[in-house]
């Protein structure tokens, strides 16, 4: 019994750095996503999604597929800017997936501009060694 407890602790210690690395890697991807969005590059944003990805926008219809996702973001880029996303937590999902919880802040392009905030949950999957968004859902804080 004691041996099992020691093994469990050792495996837990080994997993902690891997999760920290995953969180840092996912945050880097979120930074790339926000940079592309803030530049108005809908094609670059859409390229971060898997071909069969789903986006479930708050208060809008669900979209599926990279082309539909690009159209959605192109529309939203006209109204929003200054996007900053923060990864709060990452959980592994098998060998090639990760679940992420985070928050985003943004500014509207209306006059006068208004600040906004939202929370999101996404599922990432590895395709050809690269992380791609598979499911993206969010809702507004207010």
Give each language-model segment a name.
Residues 1-8:
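Bacterial N-terminal signal peptides that target proteins for export
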Residues 11-12:
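Repetitive helical segments and hydrophobic/amphipathic motifs
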Residues 16-20:
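Sec/Tat signal peptide C-region and signal peptidase I cleavage site
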Residues 21-47, 54-142:
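A beta-strand edge to alpha-helix "cap/lid" segment located at domain peripheries
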């Amino acid at each position: 019994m004691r041996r099992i407890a020691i093994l469990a602790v050792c495996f837990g210690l080994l997993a902690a750095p891997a999760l920290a690395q995953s969180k840092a890697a996912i945050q880097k991807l979120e930074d790339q996503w926000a940079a592309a969005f803030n530049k108005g590059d809908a094609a670059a944003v859409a390229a971060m999604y898997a071909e069969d990805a789903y986006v479930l926008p708050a208060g809008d219809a669900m979209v599926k597929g990279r082309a539909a996702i690009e159209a959605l973001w192109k529309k939203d880029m006209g109204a929003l800017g200054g996007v900053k996303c923060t990864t709060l937590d990452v959980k592994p999902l098998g060998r090639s997936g990760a679940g992420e919880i985070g928050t985003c802040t943004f500014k509207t392009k209306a006059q006068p501009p208004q600040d906004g905030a939202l929370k999101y949950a996404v599922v990432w999957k590895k395709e050809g060694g690269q992380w791609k968004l598979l499911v993206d859902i969010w809702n507004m804080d207010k």
